[in-house]
């Protein structure tokens, strides 16, 4: 009986050491991921991604937190398209990074560019390949130096 109690006691000590070791490993992992950014963007939809690219191009250290495994939000993941708000009548009013995205899509064959809408619902629309847009957004965020965390939900901000 004494031998059994001694073995049990030793096993408890070993298990406690293992538990402490695992806790320390977790703490070490948490410490290794402690970083700071100038800008954190909640959501890598097209607007969030464009904002992140703009901030990174201005020299900010940028982190995009995206719940899906891709950038572009509903434009790339939900079949929302074509893009339709670049023009007010015949005047193009949306330019900048969004126009750069369209030009890259056109150059790679993922879009025909801004096309006159013959139904007169809107003046121009911009059809595109959702998979092509995902690729372009990935490339542009990488070029700008943005860091992206996919499959990430925001639970708390300090």
Residue ranges of predicted features:
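The conserved SAM/SAH-binding core of class I Rossmann-like methyltransferase domains
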Residues: 42, 65-66
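Conserved N-terminal/central alpha/beta ligand/cofactor-binding core
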Residues: 3-19, 23-29, 54, 60-61, ...
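Beta1/beta-strand and adjacent pyrophosphate-binding region of the FAD-binding site
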Residues: 33-45
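N-terminal Rossmann-fold NAD(P) dinucleotide-binding loop
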Residues: 48
């Amino acid at each position: 009986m004494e031998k059994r109690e001694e073995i049990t006691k030793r096993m408890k000590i070993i298990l406690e050491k293992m538990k402490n070791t695992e806790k320390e490993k977790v703490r070490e992992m948490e410490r290794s991921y402690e970083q700071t950014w100038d800008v954190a963007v909640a959501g890598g939809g097209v607007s969030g991604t464009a904002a992140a690219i703009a901030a990174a191009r201005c020299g900010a250290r940028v982190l995009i937190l995206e719940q899906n495994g891709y950038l572009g939000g509903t434009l790339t993941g939900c079949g929302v398209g074509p893009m339709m708000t670049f023009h007010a009548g015949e005047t193009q009013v949306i330019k900048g990074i969004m126009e750069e995205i369209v030009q890259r899509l056109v150059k790679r064959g993922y879009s025909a560019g801004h096309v006159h809408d013959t139904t007169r619902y809107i003046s121009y629309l911009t059809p595109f390949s959702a998979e092509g847009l995902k690729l372009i957004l990935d490339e542009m965020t990488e070029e700008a130096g943005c860091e992206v965390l996919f499959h990430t939900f925001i639970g708390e901000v300090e």
